[in-house]
Curated annotation (Swiss-Prot):
<dbReference type="GO" id="GO:0043023">
    <property type="term" value="F:ribosomal large subunit binding"/>
</dbReference>
<dbReference type="InterPro" id="IPR023584">
    <property type="entry name" value="Ribosome_recyc_fac_dom"/>
</dbReference>
<dbReference type="Pfam" id="PF01765">
    <property type="entry name" value="RRF"/>
</dbReference>
<keyword id="KW-0648">Protein biosynthesis</keyword>
<comment type="similarity">
    <text>Belongs to the RRF family.</text>
</comment>
<comment type="function">
    <text>Responsible for the release of ribosomes from messenger RNA at the termination of protein biosynthesis. May increase the efficiency of translation by recycling ribosomes from one round of translation to another.</text>
</comment>
<dbReference type="InterPro" id="IPR036191">
    <property type="entry name" value="RRF_sf"/>
</dbReference>
<keyword id="KW-0963">Cytoplasm</keyword>
<dbReference type="GO" id="GO:0006415">
    <property type="term" value="P:translational termination"/>
</dbReference>
<dbReference type="InterPro" id="IPR002661">
    <property type="entry name" value="Ribosome_recyc_fac"/>
</dbReference>
<dbReference type="GO" id="GO:0005737">
    <property type="term" value="C:cytoplasm"/>
</dbReference>
<protein>
    <recommendedName>
        <fullName>Ribosome-recycling factor</fullName>
    </recommendedName>
</protein>
Length: 185
């Protein structure tokens, strides 16, 4: 019975880690990445549309992103969406292709990015701890209902804490790696 509680907690914590990793993909490291534009949507015939659904996005060089719209009439809309996105990118176009040169991060921008990573790390840990709380409440209610003995409930809570500690360490490791990428020159 407790195995189900552990398994559910692990699955939810895995999802929290996946959400953190997805969020960290959008944090700039000074190199071009397709995921940088994931959250950017353009107004495509009245519908908010991700850029990669209206154009071919490529990375020909480590510090350059090219965007070739399938419909040349939306080139200005794509540019506008990128400028509004608060990514600090300046697109330029030649009428057919948008080019985005990724500038090296300034020291101040690097510090901002590290702060953002730390904030995301804390949010990830909070998610994991909330899942721990839910699992512990499930165990307590099982004990209260008489489904498990008191000593088993304490062992269950210890196991949930071990699982939580493992996932908090994963969050720390993932964010430390991202921080290292940001601070690399």
């Amino acid at each position: 019975m407790l195995e189900l509680v552990y398994e559910e907690a692990r699955e939810k914590m895995d999802k929290a880690i996946a959400a953190l990793e997805k969020g960290l993909l959008r944090v700039r490291t000074g190199r071009a990445s397709l995921s940088m534009l994931d959250g950017v949507k353009l107004d495509y015939y009245g519908t908010p549309t991700p850029i990669n659904q209206a154009a071919t996005v490529a990375i020909p060089e480590s510090r350059l992103i090219t965007i070739q719209p399938w419909d040349a009439s939306v080139i200005k809309d794509i540019e506008k969406a990128i400028l509004k996105s608060d990514l600090g990118l300046n697109p330029s176009n030649d009428g057919k292709i948008i080019r985005i040169a990724i500038p090296p991060l300034t020291e101040d921008r690097r510090k901002e990015m590290v702060k953002l990573v730390n904030k995301m790390s804390e949010e990830g840990k909070i998610s994991v701890r909330n899942i721990r709380r839910d699992a512990n409440e499930t165990i307590k209610s099982m004990k209260k209902d008489g489904d498990i003995a008191e000593d088993l409930a304490f062992k269950g809570q210890d196991e949930v804490q071990k699982i939580t500690d493992d996932f908090v360490k994963k969050v720390d490791d993932i964010c430390a790696q991202k921080e290292k990428e940001i601070l690399e020159f």
